Curated annotation (Swiss-Prot):
It comes from the Bacteria. One of its GO terms (molecular function) is identical protein binding. One of its GO terms (cellular component) is cytoplasm. Catalyzes the reversible isomerization-deamination of glucosamine 6-phosphate (GlcN6P) to form fructose 6-phosphate (Fru6P) and ammonium ion. It catalyses: alpha-D-glucosamine 6-phosphate + H2O = beta-D-fructose 6-phosphate + NH4(+). Keywords: Carbohydrate metabolism, Hydrolase. The lineage of its organism: Bacteria, Bacillati, Bacillota, Clostridia, Peptostreptococcales. It comes from Alkaliphilus metalliredigens (strain QYMF). InterPro entries: Glc/Gal-6P_isomerase, Glucosamine6P_isomerase, Glucosamine6P_isomerase_CS, NagB/RpiA_transferase-like. Pathway: Amino-sugar metabolism; N-acetylneuraminate degradation; D-fructose 6-phosphate from N-acetylneuraminate: step 5/5. HAMAP family: GlcN6P_deamin (MF_01241). SUPFAM superfamilies: NagB/RpiA/CoA transferase-like. This is Glucosamine-6-phosphate deaminase. The active site is at residues 67, 136, 138, 143. GO terms for biological process: carbohydrate metabolic process; glucosamine catabolic process; N-acetylglucosamine catabolic process; N-acetylneuraminate catabolic process.
Length: 242
């Protein structure tokens, strides 16, 4: 695992954007696994700026999003579909048919999950997976659990995750209690992974995931076994690393 400690959030975001841009330049038909939440917003802004300067071209890129709230339609402003449109897709030339986000309104959850895995397979697998990390060490919506070798699935969100995500909603009661998420097994099949973290609230999770020990209660710790992982964090998130 490579660890890059940047001065602040802006530099962390630009470092991550450069890695994503390099992947696209090296392989214009790259399959990108994308994350949501507050952490990657700066990276997406930097990628849009690169696109506007004609430094990168998304026309042949395929995107695979990590997750979506279950029970939210894509036109709900808090859906991750809306998030991706507002933060990236509306501003670049990615083809709509190459955008893949789980359907939060799927009636048949099992079929949706199996179908999503099939979309990833047809795309050729994920070349570069972008991840954030929750305060409890979750990646995607893979919460602390005794089961890490799982693929796309419906997950019950932990109380801690619901509390963390309530800042995006009017009140905690509006936060969905379930989500569709790519599983750890699928994430680990990506050719390359970058994980971003910013702020002191993530410092404990970063320490736990880099401790050298695998811990099912810290899902991100499994990334230590992947051959090509880059951890890109700011100084606040790195403050507990020995």
């Amino acid at each position: 695992m490579r660890i890059y400690i940047e001065e602040d959030y802006e530099k962390m975001s630009k470092k991550a954007a450069l890695i994503v841009a390099s992947q696209i330049i090296l392989n214009p038909q790259s399959v990108l696994g994308l994350a949501t939440g507050s952490t990657p917003v700066g990276m997406y802004q930097a990628l849009v700026e690169m696109y506007e300067k004609d430094d990168i071209d998304f026309s042949e890129v395929t995107t695979i999003n990590l997750d979506e709230y279950y029970g939210l339609s894509k036109d709900n402003p808090q859906s991750y579909y809306s998030y991706m449109m507002e933060n990236l897709f509306n501003y670049i030339n990615v083809a709509k048919e190459r955008i893949h986000i789980p359907n939060g309104m799927a009636r048949n959850v099992v079929q949706e999950c199996l179908g999503y895995e099939e979309q990833i397979r047809i795309a050729g697998g994920i070349d570069l997976q972008v991840l954030g990390i929750g305060a409890n060490g979750h990646i995607g919506f893979n919460e602390p659990s005794n089961k890490l070798n799982i693929r796309t699935h419906l997950v019950d969100l932990s109380l801690e995750t619901i509390e963390d995500n309530s800042r995006f909603f009017e009140n905690k009661a509006e936060v969905p209690r379930q989500a569709l998420s790519i599983g750890i097994a699928t994430i680990m099949k990506a050719n390359q992974i970058i994980l971003l973290a910013s702020g002191a609230s993530k410092a404990e999770a970063i320490r736990e995931m880099t401790s050298g020990h695998l811990n099912t209660q810290v899902p991100a710790s499994v990334l230590q076994t992947h051959p090509n992982v880059s951890l890109i964090i700011d100084k606040d998130a790195a403050r507990l690393i020995e």
